[in-house]
């Protein structure tokens, strides 16, 4: 009888403890695809794209040719682009707030796969500002993967999904 009782207690303990230890899914999930172009060509193309605000509306933050990593940021994202790129999980009170401003920071990592092929990974971090009167709430938002796919297309992928 004692082993049965211990088994039941152990089961109840694990049943209540396990949900508390559940791992939350990451908010920033990278998108990736292979581009049939040499890595130096892809790096130069993306660096030029992010360096020209009239083309991409992004500001180049850094471009490291050694690690083949590019970071760019766009502030003051218009609401049409925002609705296309990201969604924000808010509480019931914040649901009546209106989108006021947002920023998107993208990190592009390149890896050489073959002499004429590059693996491109794009991760986007979205931060939204929502207002109701004088109250403002900043929210870390999740991607719809549209922006990441656009950047992978700019890199030269024929099917950016």
Where are these regions (language model features)?
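Positively charged n-region of N-terminal signal peptides that target proteins for export
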Residues: 1-4
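Bacterial N-terminal signal peptides
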Residues: 7-16
């Amino acid at each position: 009888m004692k082993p049965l009782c211990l088994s039941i207690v152990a089961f109840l303990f694990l049943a209540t403890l396990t949900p508390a230890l559940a791992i939350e899914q990451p908010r920033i999930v990278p998108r990736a695809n292979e581009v049939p172009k040499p890595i130096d060509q892809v790096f130069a193309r993306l660096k030029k794209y992010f360096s020209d605000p009239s083309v991409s509306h992004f500001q180049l933050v850094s471009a490291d040719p050694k690690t083949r990593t590019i970071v760019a940021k766009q502030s003051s994202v218009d609401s049409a682009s925002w609705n296309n790129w990201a969604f924000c999980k808010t509480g019931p009170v914040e649901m009546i707030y209106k989108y006021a401003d947002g920023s998107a920071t993208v990190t592009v990592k390149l890896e050489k796969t073959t002499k004429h092929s590059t693996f491109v990974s794009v991760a986007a971090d979205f931060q939204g500002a929502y207002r109701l009167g004088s109250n403002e709430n900043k929210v870390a938002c999740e991607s719809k993967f549209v922006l990441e796919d656009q950047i992978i297309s700019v890199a030269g992928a024929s099917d950016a999904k």
